[in-house]
From Swiss-Prot:
Entry similarity comment: Belongs to the APC8/CDC23 family.
Pfam families on file: ANAPC8, TPR_8
InterPro entries for this protein: APC8, TPR-like_helical_dom_sf, TPR_rpt
Biased composition (Low complexity): 635-646
Name of this chain's protein: Cell division cycle protein 23 homolog
Function: Probable component of the anaphase promoting complex/cyclosome (APC/C), a cell cycle-regulated E3 ubiquitin ligase that controls progression through mitosis and the G1 phase of the cell cycle. The APC/C complex acts by mediating ubiquitination and subsequent degradation of target proteins. Developmental role in early embryogenesis and the metaphase to anaphase transition in oocyte and spermatocyte meiosis and mitosis in germ cells. Required for embryonic anterior-posterior axis formation.
PROSITE patterns in alphabetical order: TPR (PS50005), TPR_REGION (PS50293)
UniProt keywords, alphabetically: Cell cycle, Cell division, Developmental protein, Meiosis, Mitosis, Neurotransmitter transport, Repeat, TPR repeat, Transport, Ubl conjugation pathway
Gene Ontology molecular functions: molecular adaptor activity
GO cellular component: anaphase-promoting complex
Biological processes annotated in GO: anaphase-promoting complex-dependent catabolic process; asymmetric cell division; cell division; meiotic cell cycle; neurotransmitter transport; polarity specification of anterior/posterior axis; positive regulation of metaphase/anaphase transition of meiosis I; positive regulation of mitotic metaphase/anaphase transition
Consequence of changing S502F: In or172, or180 and or187; maternal-effect embryonic lethal
Amino acid sequence: MNVSFSTPVQNSTASRLALIQQAAARSGALPPAGQYRGSKLSPFDVSQMSGVSISMVERAKINGPEFVEELEWLRQQTTSRCFLDAEMWTNEILAHLPDKWCAPNTLNLYNQVSELVLDNTRSPMASPASNSLYAPGEDQMPTVKRNHTSRFAQSLIKNKEFRRAAFFLEKTMNGNKLDHFLHFRCLFLAYYQEHLENDAEGIERKTSFAEERSPFSLLYQRMEDKKLRENEDVWFEYLMGLLEVELGLKDLAEKSFRNVVIREPRIWPAWEALSRLIADIEDADKFVTSAEVKSLWMGDWFMTLVLQRFHQHSMAIQKAEQLVTRGMTGLPMIITKIAACSNARHDHDQAISNFEDVRKADPYRLGDLHLLSDSLYIRNDQKKLSTLAIEVYKVHKFRWETCCIVANYHAIRRDSEHAIKFFQRALRLNPGLAALWVLIGHEFMEMKNNAAACVSYRRAIEIDPADHRGWYGLGQMYDIMKMPAYALFYYQEAQKCKPHDSRLLVALGDIYSKLNRIEDAEKCFTGAYLFGDVEGNALWSLAKLHERYSDDNKAAQAFEVFLVVYELVTSAEEKIIYAIAFLANHFFKIEDFDKASEYATKCLAFETLCQEGNRLFREIAKIQARESRLPVEEAPGPSNASAAGGQEAMDTEEAPQEGGEEEMSEGEDDFSF
């Protein structure tokens, strides 16, 4: 039977046991979550399971000197243009270079080629005659004073005094190409900062411009009038792409960032911005592999971010590990990304292990560390979480990651009021993060404040409709409130965002079963198992569904596969005990005494089932003894007639004893079938 893995559920004429067994075989080929390194799972298998197709071509080892040259160029560009985040990102990679790439001749390679020149911008579109430092026909400020003013403006940018910096750069912009760019960038940063400050208290509350146009719109029009998109400095087009994002012109912004990457593939901020806008994974892969893009390694890292954004975390891990295989070993950036993807896949042990490796190399690094607190919270490791919260609170008290970690610490102690307080503080520091609203919603649910939880989840959906967690939170809330029709809608929306998440399919199946839509529920539970049952609930829910509607044969089939998969999992002991008891009694009822004896034997391995197992053995022995006497009773002869009366009397005497044993066994355990 051929099975399509591009959709979570399907109709099939084959038996349900065959479908489940095929799912077990398919899932059995997968390694444990987060353990792809050294496994036999091919990129094609991962692609088939995820429903998307990208190129996983084996690429050659990264050339160390070329890698360093790219980063040195980017470091100089981001430093001179005051892109502080990109500068720190670049310097972190350079600081963790593999030892073999740190030879003196390698590190000095680029510095021997050129020194930093303020107006130098490498671009294939630049003309040799266009590198004049001064704009034609403009008055020139004395060189010394201009240099001092430029340096002062750059200091103001680093101090986040953007309007003040723009004021001073306006004096020097006509005599210096770099200051020309920085002036427009400072205006953008000033408007962006004011926008965030206005929206800090209420995300998505739009500022009203009743009498004047948006400052972003005015700045964009000014740059269009000056034809800065065609400027030899490619960074102008990148800046216009950022303006287009703020104006809601997402298609134009995507086109701008694509052009920037084609013109200068070493500008990582353009790759990063494009990863947040590109429409789908296949389109991103086609762009990266096109002949126009000449990238040594940034294209692969870009694909890792795109795959993570579209919730293809297994494939993102593989892409990241490809970079490690190609030589980028020991980089906290890559290890942290693998940890973040493991967290999203609910492989929290792997995530914790990876984060701990990063903290050994860089103890004060906060990037994505809130996800470590999330994994510790889910693992209920209060000791490690409290230690982490104390350490980061001492050093980085006013970072949003710290606020999330401290909030999770209060949450694990069931102090929801303090948890909400710190989550709200994190929102003020990073107002555009939908995940924070989701976490606040969870805490309101703990406090049984459904109205506030509903508002929080809806805020998360407004900020990022593609994030399944806001939809899933609303579905859970309505499910708890016994409103399954509402819950169904939000679970369906969540499943659209992340169609291969087994948790969402199990939740959908539960709602369908509550609405008596049995076939839909069965498809969801089966589909959840097909896509790798993360929490181990799909087969169990499928078996209980059939048991609830008295379809014991199908329930037994599901319980059998459940035991094959989970019998050795200690955390599922209660479910294992129930499944064994059900199967032992089921096969006894249908008189399959061989299988009944097999499961009765398994009953003896559990203290709570010993008496049930012994009772079944006695019942089976009596039935088999009775059946063995039947041929003797039916044989012709005078002795049989005389023995019939005596045998009948013996059966009459034994009957109360059997009934007594049944009465004794009744109530010996908590299982009822």
